[in-house]
Curated annotation (Swiss-Prot):
Sites of S-diacylglycerol cysteine lipidation: 16
Swiss-Prot/TrEMBL keywords: Cell membrane, Glycosidase, Hydrolase, Lipoprotein, Membrane, NAD, Palmitate, Signal
Organism: Phocaeicola vulgatus (strain ATCC 8482 / DSM 1447 / JCM 5826 / CCUG 4940 / NBRC 14291 / NCTC 11154)
Family assignment from sequence similarity: Belongs to the Gfo/Idh/MocA family. Glycosyl hydrolase 109 subfamily.
InterPro entries: Gfo/Idh/MocA-like_OxRdtase_N, Gfo/Idh/MocA_oxidrdct_glycsds, Glyco_hydro_109_C, NAD(P)-bd_dom_sf
Protein name according to UniProt: Glycosyl hydrolase family 109 protein 1
Cited function: Glycosidase.
Upper lineage: Bacteria, Pseudomonadati, Bacteroidota, Bacteroidia, Bacteroidales
EC number: 3.2.1.-
Amino acid sequence: MIKNLSTFFVGIALSCLAGCTPIPKETTATKEYAPLEVPVPERPAGQQDVIELTTPKLDTVRVGFIGLGMRGPSAVERWTHIPGTKIVALCDLLPENAEKAQKIVTNAGMEAPALYSGSEDAWKQLCERNDIDLVYIATDWKHHTEMGIYAMEHGKHAAIEVPAAMSLDEIWALINTSEKTRKHCMQLENCVYDFFELTTLNMAQKGLFGEVLHVEGSYIHNLEEFWPYYWNNWRLDYNREFRGDVYATHGLGPACQLLNIHRGDRMKTLVAMDTKAVTGPELVKQYQKEEAPDFQNGDHTMTFIRTENGKTIHIQHDVMNPRPYSRMYQLTGTKGFANKYPIEQYCFRPDQIDSTSIPDHENLSMHSAVPEKVKEALMSQYKHPIHQELEETAKKIGGHGGMDFIMDYRLVYCLRNGLPLDMDVYDLAEWCCMADLTRLSIENGNAPVAVPDFTRGNWNKVDGYHHAFAQ
């Protein structure tokens, strides 16, 4: 009986195999699938790119601030500590916010700046003044682009909080305005100045990691305690309305600098996906007392990007759930590895460590992180020149541990010395385009999407990312 059953099952198996159609060889071959593409407008006649744009030196950088709610006042405070500056004007829709910021300036022993408030268009009067060089914009996201364009059109440089633009149309408008007016348009991305990031960038530029092949970044920040404090629930409303990675810049900015994006390489294609929205609708019900079955932004969004030179980037976004804060910041190179969260660590091939300057190198292997003492010695040895100058002062003044102060200081330093800024309008474009492009990918079944060349052909004009310094 057992023999008969065995013969029966073998017969069934052979029959099934005989009935299967062999997989054609051609189906296993690699095929090229055209990604979704968005239009790239032609550069208007007479315009040129603003890569490494320089403008005349400013003895004193005269600044006007727009938006004095959550982030603006701390920026005003930081600027009272930066030499070679004058705070000329302050603007907020609410008069009390402008008045509080004015007291920050006068309490620092400086002349009281002019105030603009009480009207939706009061900020335009600030931009129209002839005694301002730079407009510093820290409003809600939806007003960033309009204000930046108006400032440049009225002869001012524009520094815009993250994200500076939320759509491709806004991005191209900022690019064209900067190119047309020859004014700087910089996104205020602070995380590129954090201590581990800038030190690691210096190591990478010195070749310590070999060829950097893969980088990661994220914005993972449980905003539970902050949701009630966004004016008129603007941030929750934005997440309710838009799908995709709407806040990619903190993770993507440092990653792009490591890969020399639009300075020898460019982001070419991305694929994005998200989870369903669970926490968002609950927050709307909690704070706005209404149901939100239409809530668009998934609790967790992830994006994978491939560059022209065959490098890869992984970005995540999650502001909804109880996870430890993380910007990930990770790089993988042919000779080394770096990781910031949850702990700062480096890993190298043994021959990458100089035994004359780094202790205990015999204990290193390519399979484990270097000991803490070795990590500290490396970070000291490769401390970035910017941190060598500013670390002590930055940590004293503060602003997310000091990186905000360094960001503002470097902006002023470059303007006063007539140097290219550390971040240009194309950085702004590349880091902000994730909002529109990831949405497009997700809404089309996680389809590949081509990342536009915002430089319009000049992405390899500069050989590698670098910071400018006065001679």
